[in-house]
């Protein structure tokens, strides 16, 4: 068994403007209307996010540009948008995860780093799960951090790395 776990921007729910329940029903409907493997939208992480993709991921332009560099160098690593099937399963699995009574029995020390301004995953869901875990530490980041906490500007990244280092030193020396 692992001595400890660190979860960074954990996907315990997906961020959606229409609510998780409605979004799950919509994804299931769309999955059933055609090829379930077809892309749910064009682009990358979210519909309409093409111009705001960097803001969804990190406020650090140089770290974002580094990612773009690698996409150009190794195009096969670039992910496309999720399929309707992926979305339906993601909504269902995260809903079931959040409701799992075994969360309250996890003895392993867990550190959760959560970006409250995350535009991809539901930070409220992650914070809620952290409250269910008997041995969890929660480190919250505000507007200064987007989804990719470890690819953020140095002050955010440094705070995250310091929290991880202190946690692992204490829990898994």
Annotate each predicted stretch with a short phrase.
Residues 82-102:
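Active-site nucleophile elbow and catalytic-triad environment of alpha/beta-hydrolase enzymes
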């Amino acid at each position: 068994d692992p001595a400890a776990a660190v979860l960074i921007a954990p996907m315990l729910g997906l961020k959606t403007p229409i609510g998780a329940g409605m979004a799950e029903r919509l994804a299931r409907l769309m999955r059933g209307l055609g090829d379930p493997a077809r892309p749910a939208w064009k682009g990358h992480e979210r519909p309409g996010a093409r111009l705001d993709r960097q803001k969804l991921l990190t406020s650090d332009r140089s770290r974002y540009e580094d990612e773009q560099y690698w996409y150009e160098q190794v195009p096969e690593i670039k992910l496309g948008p999720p399929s309707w099937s992926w979305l339906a399963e993601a909504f269902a699995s995260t809903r079931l995860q959040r409701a799992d009574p075994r969360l309250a029995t996890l003895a392993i020390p867990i550190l959760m780093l959560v970006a409250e301004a995350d535009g991809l995953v539901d930070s409220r869901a992650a914070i809620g799960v952290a409250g269910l875990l008997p041995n969890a530490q929660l480190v919250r980041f505000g507007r200064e951090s987007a989804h990719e906490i470890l690819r953020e500007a140095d002050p955010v990244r440094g705070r995250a790395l310091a929290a991880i280092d202190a946690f692992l030193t204490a829990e898994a020396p």
